[in-house]
């Protein structure tokens, strides 16, 4: 007998680009496609897990809107952000996996009012990934001998493509290992709505003068690696959904 899909446990998965959602889309069964304000949502199931896969578009505003729609319209129980990121760490090469423990904005500065660089008023210095979800993902990566790093990742509406920009970020955020354009905004929305988040990214470039060319060359590799880890982690996460929902450390 076919196992029933438990639709009460919808998982929202967000990526910015078509390349970043394509592999998961190819795995979707019994899917339908919706478009809201030029944001594409793919509703279906992967390995009998009910998911809403969203292609947000690039940047903080698009990704934030997408996350809010997933939470309000599609009533997802938790969010996974996947896709590519630029490296700020010499040990992270194209294709490397990162699962950030926390994220913040690199293009926010309210230090004149006593806040830390990257901190929004009435919010913490960084937004945290869900502890249990991180542990389950780490367990999968460790058991399958997949190398990864997990520290701070920073986000902003800037593609980092010079050594000067990279050096400035490393100076301002010495603990950051990678940079993208969406994760902090998605985590911010999850934080406001008290929804847990997991971020699974793969490196596409080194955030330097060759970043644009390397991004074009390695985006498919980064998308593939991020997606394959996500697909394999989904089943583990689903088994622990109830625990995850009660282990939320993402509240303002």
UniProtKB/Swiss-Prot annotation:
GO terms for cellular component: cytosol. Its EC number is 3.2.2.9. It is an enzyme of class 3 (hydrolase). One of its GO terms (molecular function) is methylthioadenosine nucleosidase activity. GO terms for biological process: L-methionine salvage from methylthioadenosine; L-methionine salvage from S-adenosylmethionine; purine deoxyribonucleoside catabolic process. Belongs to the PNP/UDP phosphorylase family. MtnN subfamily. This is 5'-methylthioadenosine/S-adenosylhomocysteine nucleosidase.
């Amino acid at each position: 007998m076919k196992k029933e899909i438990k639709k009460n446990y919808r998982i929202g998965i967000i990526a910015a680009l078509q390349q970043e959602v394509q592999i998961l889309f190819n795995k979707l069964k019994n899917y339908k496609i919706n478009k809201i304000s030029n944001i594409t949502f793919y509703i279906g199931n992967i390995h009998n897990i009910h998911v809403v896969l969203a292609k947000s578009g690039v940047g903080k505003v698009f990704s934030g809107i997408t996350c809010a729609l997933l939470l309000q319209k599609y009533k997802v129980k938790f969010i996974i952000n996947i896709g590519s990121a630029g490296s700020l760490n010499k040990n992270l090469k194209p294709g490397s996996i990162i699962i950030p423990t926390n994220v913040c904005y690199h293009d926010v500065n309210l230090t004149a009012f006593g806040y830390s660089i990257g901190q929004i008023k009435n919010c913490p210095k960084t937004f945290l990934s869900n502890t249990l979800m991180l542990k389950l993902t780490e367990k999968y990566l460790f058991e399958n001998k997949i190398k990864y790093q997990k520290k701070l990742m920073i986000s902003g509406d800037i593609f980092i493509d010079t050594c000067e920009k990279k050096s400035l970020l490393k100076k301002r955020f010495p603990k950051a290992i990678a940079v993208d354009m969406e994760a902090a905004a998605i985590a911010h929305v999850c934080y406001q709505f008290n929804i847990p988040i997991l971020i699974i990214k793969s490196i596409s470039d080194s955030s330097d003068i060759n970043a644009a060319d390397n991004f074009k060359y390695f985006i498919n590799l980064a998308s593939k690696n991020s997606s394959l880890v996500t697909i394999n982690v989904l089943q583990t996460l689903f088994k622990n959904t109830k625990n995850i929902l009660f282990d939320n450390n993402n509240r303002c």
